[in-house]
């Protein structure tokens, strides 16, 4: 399963114990290879995803999950979305400021890969982690955890 299958599954919707998860909107990103997803749970916005499909041979694919509702973290929806995106994307960015446990762990000095979110990403095969607690410019967005696998 990869890009088109991932998008198809999300557009069709996925029933969870929490309710129905679905891709409510897809719009063109800044580049030809980039799309913006709006993902809903039970008809309410859950998060946005910036999806970059790569530009071979120069740039690899990545996805960033941001403006995430606090109720997402620690749920079946979080587990499923991270699993689905991890199958297609070797680089994943997850904004964590509404993930109170991960935020607290990072502020106390716990390494990114040992936080609640980091352990979840590590279990999906990611091996490199970076805490973007101080984004370098105005385009990078908020605090996020970067996870990559080779």
Question: Can you name each region flagged by the protein language model?
Answer:
Residues 1-73, 87-150:
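Non-catalytic substrate-recognition and accessory regions of acyl/acetyltransferase enzymes
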Residues 72-80:
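A short glycine-leucine-enriched loop at secondary-structure breakpoints
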């Amino acid at each position: 399963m990869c890009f088109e299958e991932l998008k198809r599954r999300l557009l069709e919707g996925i029933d969870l114990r929490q309710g129905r998860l679905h891709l409510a909107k897809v719009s063109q990103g800044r580049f030809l290879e980039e799309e913006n997803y709006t993902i809903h749970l039970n008809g309410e916005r859950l998060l946005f995803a910036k999806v970059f499909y790569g530009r071979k041979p120069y740039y690899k694919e990545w996805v960033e999950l941001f403006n995430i509702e606090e109720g997402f973290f620690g749920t079946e929806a979080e587990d499923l979305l991270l699993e689905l995106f991890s199958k297609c994307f070797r680089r994943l960015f997850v904004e964590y400021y509404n993930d109170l446990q991960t935020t607290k762990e990072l502020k106390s000095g716990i390494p990114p890969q040992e936080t609640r979110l980091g352990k979840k990403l590590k279990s999906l095969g990611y091996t490199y982690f970076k805490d973007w607690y101080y984004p370098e410019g105005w385009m990078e967005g908020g605090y996020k955890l970067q996870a990559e696998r080779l």
